[in-house]
Amino acid sequence: MALAKRIIPCLDVDNGRVVKGVKFENIRDAGDPVEIARRYDEQGADEITFLDITASVDGRDTTLHTVERMASQVFIPLTVGGGVRTVQDIRNLLNAGADKVSINTAAVFNPEFVGEAAQHFGSQCIVVAIDAKKVSGPGETPRWEIFTHGGRKPTGLDAVEWAKKMEGLGAGEILLTSMDQDGMKNGFDLGVTRAISDALGIPVIASGGVGNLQHLADGILEGHASAVLAASIFHFGEYTVQEAKAYMSKRGIVMR
């Protein structure tokens, strides 16, 4: 039997506030991540991903406090990422109530950190986030490269090979964002999603580009992802998580 697939709403948080606007009806304060996460929990989300985009060090304490509040009110798995550089950072987040921790830039600069983290805490806690951009031209063999700093800095690393390396070091899951598609609302980059999903034995979460429910289903049916992540289609109340799950079930996808 096929493993059940997951829908994961994503919150971008800066200094304890959600920054990609959220326009749910009946939310008193659209900026409070705990209230928003609770709404997604009620709607039947399988997990929540919380990406801390605060640059400042003082923002970190706010983040830990927010994670503590969220973990006390939301009863689905919580992945937290952003600025995770040390084993102590991971320990702090797990102690605050995160179930999984996402490592992005630090993995590129110090791949062994992923292995160390997996040894300390177990692969099931360690997600490696990959930001990939297509670098091949028309007619060339498709190739995607890892970028850092919000898609601004190329690394020269091949995205598929890098994902395999991360799996080998002990990552339990890959969060794959297509920088070309992010925010475009015309669907995932199914090419890179499929290339990485097919190359790995661990789950791949597709991210970047969801504009409608068909895009979510495509990520799984055509991209072979294990889970799909979206922000704005849920934040702005265009669709609820229930509607997304119902649509995907109708397309024959076994949902959690």
Curated annotation (Swiss-Prot):
Keywords: Amino-acid biosynthesis, Cytoplasm, Histidine biosynthesis, Lyase. The keyword Thylakoid does not apply. Signal peptide: none annotated. The keyword ATP-binding does not apply. It catalyses: 5-[(5-phospho-1-deoxy-D-ribulos-1-ylimino)methylamino]-1-(5-phospho-beta-D-ribosyl)imidazole-4-carboxamide + L-glutamine = D-erythro-1-(imidazol-4-yl)glycerol 3-phosphate + 5-amino-1-(5-phospho-beta-D-ribosyl)imidazole-4-carboxamide + L-glutamate + H(+). Its EC number is 4.3.2.10. GO terms for cellular component: cytoplasm. It comes from the Bacteria. GO terms for molecular function: imidazoleglycerol-phosphate synthase activity; lyase activity. SUPFAM superfamilies: Ribulose-phoshate binding barrel (SSF51366). Pathway: Amino-acid biosynthesis; L-histidine biosynthesis; L-histidine from 5-phospho-alpha-D-ribose 1-diphosphate: step 5/9. The active site is at residues 12, 131. One of its GO terms (biological process) is L-histidine biosynthetic process. HAMAP family: HisF (MF_01013). IGPS catalyzes the conversion of PRFAR and glutamine to IGP, AICAR and glutamate. The HisF subunit catalyzes the cyclization activity that produces IGP and AICAR from PRFAR using the ammonia provided by the HisH subunit. This is Imidazole glycerol phosphate synthase subunit HisF. It comes from Pseudomonas fluorescens (strain Pf0-1).
